[in-house]
Amino acid sequence: MKAKMKKHACTYPGCSKAFTRAEHLRRHSLNHETISNSQGYTCQRCMTHFSRADLLSRHLDRHAKKDAEAGGFGKGVLETRKRMRRAEDGSIVLRPPKRPSRHQQKTGPPVGAPLSSSGSVSAGSGRSSRSPDVSLHAAQAPVSPPRSASDPVSVSGVSIDDDGTDPDPMLAPMMPGGPFEPYVEPIPGQFDAADGSWGGFDALGDGMMLDTATDFNLPFAATGNYNWLFDVSSLDDAFHHLELPLGPDLVPFANSHGNYASVNTMELSGAGAENVQDSMLNLDLDIDLNGLPAGFVHDQGPDGSSASVLLQAASFVERGNINGSDPKRDFPDLDWMAGAPPIESTVPLRPQLSEDARRGILTLIAQSPPVDIHGQPLNLDSPLLSLSALQSYSDLFFSRFNTTYPLIHSATFDPNKTEPVFLASILSMGATYSSREAHQLAVGIHDGLRNQLFCHGAFSPQPDELWVLQAMLLIDCFGKMRAGPKQRERAQLFHCVLIKLIRRSTCCSIRADTHSDPGLGGLELEDAWKRAMDAEQRKRLAFQCFMWDTEHSVLFSQSLCMSAFEIRSSLPCSPAAWEAHTAEEWSRHASRDTEHAFLPVLKGYITPGSVSRPRDLNRFSRMVVLHGLMSISADLKRRDQTTLRAETPERVGAWTPRMGRAYDLWKADFDADCLNMKLGPVQVSADETRRFTSLKAAAMALYRAASLALHVEVLDLQIAAGASHILGRVVKQHDRERSRVMLSRWLSGPSPAATTASRHAAALLQDAVLSLHDWDQTDAFHFPWCLYLATLTVWAFHAREGCVPKPTDLSSLIVAMTTSNAADLEGLAGQYDTRPLIRAMAQQLATVRWAVVHDAMKVLLNLGV
């Protein structure tokens, strides 16, 4: 089939190459013209030799670009992967790579030394020779001056050969799912990436972009982005060898305080990977290590390596508690569903509002006054708008919202010098954590804020003011996750406007070192602190917008608007540096921070063998990385849905196991980080403990839901369960019938997708039920929606035709599903009555003030009848 599609055959004598497009044949023919008519071309700066003049011209352009970036002619350093060089005697040689590639280690012959007039370079097994006689006229060629760089850099430590032995990893397949054609070189802009530096974070901008159109039309991830991320020459090659270790480096974490639990190295390969993945599903960090048996030893994997102490201890204690009589795990009634009283959160700094700030807010509200419950304009003398009330909204924003989503730097934020529209967006968000009346007031204020912001003089298509973007992000978040359907639909319309403005700013590429100079003091140090925090807020704004966009794509099946590849910033700074009250305190903490670029860290989880994962990531950075993995999964899913797979239908979803392992590797690191905090010698405050508990619950819920979404279409779950509206569209009967058919195939299919998704769902519900006293401390907006998806998954798993489920209480259902292995769980499908679980979750979701969750609650109520 593929041979018939290659209609454009090369007519050069002895060449049997054929191509799918005429343009590919035209570029290929240039190689034959070079053999017949030219002696080759040599760069006079670095002695790199090319077979074609157009390739040399592009190479010289890159020299000029590097010189311009370095500040003058001859100052730029261009590191190229091309290994064909002109030696001092005029002959053409191939410089050997730093280390052989994986392909060469297995089958490829060693690269030769100088090329003789009678020799040629093999283009690989089954390929015709294409190298010209390059040394025939070598003595006549000009001698080049000293080169501009040393040895060529490599992609993930593998030097890439340009003669066809190893395909260039930045060259994309010419056809979806089709063969890679190494002679088709180069698509404009691809050679820029191949000749750029891959040695460090500073070079990501050059290496990741294939062409100008890609650079200016994000967020669409190009093939080269994925080739780099998965460390392959073609994305189709990324998922063929899943039996190889994908997570080999669970090594001990560095301990800044001197005391950590030991975590042994573990290989995730073969059958051992399944065992480890099963253990990861059942991790629970409420661990008393003294309860382990005296004879507790490390289980040996199939290769003799020790498994992780962390994973074994957690899974052992989980099983022990379930079989024991822990009162927290007995559920005689559902009193816990009534919810705990609001916690008294405290924060180190609470910006204080003045009467002038209040007058600015009232003036803004008067331009578009909200209405009360009777439909009358709200009186500006209302107690809900008093100075004390506004101050309470501000306190709630910084103690609840800004703790979960650290966007605004409270130490440098002055509400009395802030634009009223920005301050109003902060206060309205804080009011949603107050009484229902205050929440209703906030919704009314919100309805006019977007117009007020668009009409402000500081708003422009090229925003310079940070507060404009911050206000727009808060307004977008409020409309989507803190209000009703009308506000949500409006927010959806303007979501892409926000992303476009962020792209036009510098927020996605904050690379400046935020460390302080030890020699600074006084006003200089104060200015350095404010500049660093301004950059940090810009960075966090882009990250948070990216995270919310990713959540809505994965958890709601909405279109992904941002790509992980457009985030070129370093990860957020440490909480200590972020929460410092003074410039001196910030300087002390920032000097100990280590910057980590987002994309290389992300690659460390997807392709563990290529990049080492940093062990000193803070918890917010770990959440960013998880969202990066989710974004990659969502985009790969989109590629499956939009790529023509007529020839390779087996590759649809082939990425799922690898991304699932990346999720599990992230969880193992997160668990080890949490365990260290729990067992470390440093005592933390009660407020820090509450924040840690909230973050842990939110992170685990998101991990479970993201893993669940890998194996089931969440829209099918909602539609089959009875949702009346999805993404603003009315669900019709044929939609419901289609979703039920899809779920039936999902349940009865040969793959373990249904079992895997159900195990993640049950684990998520177990975590929620066991965190009885921590429910109200989880301010993450995604948490109730994750519970809803998990409940629907368990319902679908047991709602099989022809099965008569037996009456089951909530605790028995959860325990049965979380303590069974994959094979046993498959046999339990359709055996349990899920109505007690559905009713319990519906009762809990009824307490959430979010229209989307309210609709979800109504779906559960209908299912629980």
UniProtKB/Swiss-Prot annotation:
CDD domains: fungal_TF_MHR. GO terms for molecular function: DNA-binding transcription factor activity, RNA polymerase II-specific; RNA polymerase II cis-regulatory region sequence-specific DNA binding; zinc ion binding. Keywords: Metal-binding, Nucleus, Repeat, Zinc, Zinc-finger. It comes from Emericella nidulans (strain FGSC A4 / ATCC 38163 / CBS 112.46 / NRRL 194 / M139). One of its GO terms (biological process) is DNA-templated transcription. This is Nicotinate catabolism cluster-specific transcription factor. InterPro entries: Transcription_factor_dom_fun, VerF-like, Znf_C2H2_sf, Znf_C2H2_type. GO terms for cellular component: chromatin; nucleus. Residues 96-105 have a biased composition (Basic residues). The keyword Zinc applies. The keyword Secreted does not apply. A motif (Nuclear localization signal(NLS)) lies at residues 77-87.
